[in-house]
């Protein structure tokens, strides 16, 4: 008897819940679009170019010097003394190795800084999305890249977020 009373009360309770009460308020946002258009991204690109400019110039100079020595070896190698040719070849091998190591280190540090700055911007965008969602009482916010289809009832908050991100 208690079981039937419980079931009956649950059925009555469920039927009294309106469909509006059961619906979640859902929004979508295009994170990649916001990231690509953010003014912070443009500032970071310029900042990183400035930060790595001297090292990039140094690498370009090293590469140019290597190319000049290679041309000298190719052009004059046949007429050089064996000792001179051998010393030039050793010098080239040594300079190539130094250049290769510096270029690899440069690429790794540049990539690391780009990743660090990208993550800062994405975290800031995520915070803005969270604030907009809370302010406008959204239950769920989904990135448009994760959605294959959405109806017109789903609100796109990309512009609201974009305005706050700048």
From Swiss-Prot:
It is found in: Periplasm. GO terms for biological process: chaperone-mediated protein folding; protein stabilization. GO terms for cellular component: cytosol; periplasmic space. Keywords: Chaperone, Periplasm, Signal. InterPro entries: Chaperone_Skp, Skp_dom_sf. Pfam families: OmpH. Residues 1-22 form the signal peptide. The keyword Signal applies. Residues 102-113 are annotated as: Lipopolysaccharide binding. SMART domains: OmpH. One of its GO terms (molecular function) is unfolded protein binding. Molecular chaperone that interacts specifically with outer membrane proteins, thus maintaining the solubility of early folding intermediates during passage through the periplasm. Belongs to the Skp family. Homotrimer. This is Chaperone protein Skp. The gene is skp.
């Amino acid at each position: 008897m208690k079981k039937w009373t419980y079931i009956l009360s649950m059925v009555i309770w469920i039927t009294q819940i309106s469909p509006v009460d059961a619906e979640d308020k859902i929004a979508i946002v295009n994170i990649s679009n916001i990231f690509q258009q953010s003014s912070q991204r443009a500032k970071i690109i310029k900042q990183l170019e400035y930060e790595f400019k001297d090292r990039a110039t140094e690498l370009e100079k090293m590469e140019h010097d290597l190319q000049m020595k290679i041309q000298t070896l190719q052009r004059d190698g046949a007429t050089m003394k064996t000792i001179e040719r051998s010393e030039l070849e050793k010098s080239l091998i040594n300079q190539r190795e130094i250049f290769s190591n510096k270029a690899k280190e440069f690429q790794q540090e540049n990539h690391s800084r780009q990743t660090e700055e990208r993550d800062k911007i994405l975290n800031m965008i995520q915070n803005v999305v969270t604030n907009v969602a809370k302010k406008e009482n959204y239950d769920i916010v989904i990135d448009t890249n994760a959605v294959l289809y959405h109806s017109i009832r789903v609100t796109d908050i990309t512009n609201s977020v974009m305005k706050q991100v700048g």
